[in-house]
UniProtKB/Swiss-Prot annotation:
Residues annotated as binding iron-sulfur cluster: C42, C106, C108
NCBIfam families reported in the protein's UniProt record: iron-sulfur cluster assembly accessory protein, PRK13623.1
Protein name per the record: Iron-sulfur cluster insertion protein ErpA
Cofactor note: Binds 1 iron-sulfur cluster per subunit.
Length: 114
């Protein structure tokens, strides 16, 4: 997808840069970062990240800096208007989701409720 098109989910430059480094480390240019939502965590839903070399029917793909973020349709409905970012700080480094649909989140930020 083009950067000029309004996307339902943003893939930040910092996240794309880190994905690019991690894919290079794996020596598999077919890998994409997949973000998904599952039931669980202390707030009802939790975010998950994995590297995947497949794009399934219905998946949305966002490309930036030559790498791709992939989201399945079920997860996307909970992520519309959000952003996938990468942060480094005192708590360590990690991919994070900023989600305007979340009514509450847990302290670690990986679990939320709607």
């Amino acid at each position: 997808m083009s950067d000029d098109v309004a996307l339902p989910l943003q893939f930040t430059e910092a996240a794309a840069k880190k994905v690019k480094v991690l894919i290079a480390d794996e020596n598999n240019p077919e890998l994409k970062l997949r973000v998904y939502i599952t039931g669980g965590g202390c707030s009802g839903f939790q975010y998950g990240f994995t590297f995947d070399d497949q794009i399934n029917d219905g998946d949305m793909t966002i490309e930036k800096q030559g790498v791709a973020l992939v989201v399945d349709p079920m997860s996307l409905q909970y992520l519309v208007g959000g952003a996938v970012d990468y942060t480094e700080g005192l708590e360590g480094s990690r991919f994070v989701v900023t989600n305007p649909n979340a009514k509450s989140t847990c302290g670690c930020g990986s679990s939320f409720s709607i």
